[in-house]
Amino acid sequence: MLACVAMSVLAMGQNNQLVWANGRLLYGTPIESIDSLTYDAMQDIDTLHLLLPRTLIKVVHDTVYIHDTVYVETDCGGEGDTPSAGIGVFSVSADKQVTFSKGNLQYTQSTNIWSFAENQWDYIGTDNVIGGSVYSNPTYGDDKNGTALADKVDLFGWSTSATNFGVSTSKDDDDYYGSFVDWGTNKIGNDAPNTWRTLTYDEWHYLRYTRTNADDLVGVTQVNGVNGLIFLPDNWVCPSGVSFKSGFHSRDCVDYYAAYQTFTADQWSKLEAAGAVFLPAAGYRHGFGVSTVQGTGHYWSATEYDSNCAYNLPFSSGGAHMVNVNRSDGYSVRLVKDL
C-alpha cells in the first residue's frame, strides 16, 4: 500500500466538495456518488484550499480524473500501511480543530490489537462480558451481569499505566490511580502510535457548549436502529434529501431517541459524508456488569477530577452534560486527530 500521496487541482468550484465515505467517492453540491472508480490503496489528504475549508478527502492509487475538473496523482517513494480517515472538522477551542475517528475504540485481548469500529453506530454492548443473561428494561436499556470480560471489548476504565489502558474489571478506583495514559499512544489498526488522542474536559465542553452555533450542531437520534448522539461539523451544510433536528427530547427513555428523529443507513451515509459524527448509546460497565445499553452513552475525557474520578460526557435522550465519574467504570472512547 502507498505511504504518501501528492495532489494537484487544475480547476474546481469552491462550492463543491470531494469526500470519501462508506465506500464511495462523493463529489459536488449536492454531493453525488461517482461509481466508475476503484478504491484500493486509499489515502487521506487535505485540499489545496480550493474545496470547502479543511475538507478531508480520499483518493485512489494511480492517476484518475474526477468530473473532468480535478486531477489527482499519487507519488510515493516507499511502501506502508494506509492510515484511517477522520470524520468532519470540529472546533474544540478558539484556535484548534480536530477530526473524529470513524468509530468507537475497540480492543481484542487475545491478539493485543486496538481498532476502530467499522461503522459509527457499531458498539459491543452487553457482549463486553460473557456469561449471564440480558435483561431488557424498556425505560433504561439492556443490562447484563456476566462472569468474565469478553475477548473483544469497547468499554474501558479510565486509562492509566497500571490498568492496560483501562482493560480491567476492578471496581476499586484506587487500582486506577495515576496520571492518564492516552489510548492514542497505541497503534490502532494501521495507524502509527500517537496518531489519535482523547479530548480533554475543556475540549469536550467547548465542542458541546462554546463553539459557534453549538446548540444547533448537536442532537439525539436513532441511526440504522441504534440510539445515540450526533455532533455536526463547524461548517455544516445539510445534504439534500435529509433534514436534521438539533436538541433533545423532553424525557429520558430508550424509545425517545427514535421518537425525536430517525435516520436510515442510506440517510446516515449522506450525513456522514457531510461530516456528521454519531456516538452510539453503548451503556457502561462496572466490573462484570454492563448496564443501560441503548439508554445512555458515556464517553471518556483525558482529564482527571481527583485520584478517584475523571470527567466524561454522558448523554441520554433528554440531554448531554459533562460530569465526573468513578475511574473504575467502563465507558466508551471516541478518539480525535488534530488538524
Would you name each region that the model predicts?
Residues 77-339:
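Conserved positions within compact, well-structured domain cores
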Residues 21-46:
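N-terminal targeting signals for Sec/Tat export/insertion, comprising classic cleavable signal peptides
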Residues 26-32, 61, 247, 312-315:
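Short amphipathic beta-strand/extended segments with alternating polar/hydrophobic composition
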Residues 15-30, 87-95, 233:
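Short N-terminal segments immediately surrounding and downstream of signal-peptide cleavage
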Residues 36, 47, 62-63, 69, ...:
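Coil residues (strongly favoring Ser/Thr
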Residues 43-78:
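Collagen/collagen-like triple-helix sequence repeat recognition
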Residues 11-15, 42-45, 83-87, 308:
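A short, compositionally biased
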Residues 1-17:
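Bacterial Sec-dependent N-terminal signal peptides
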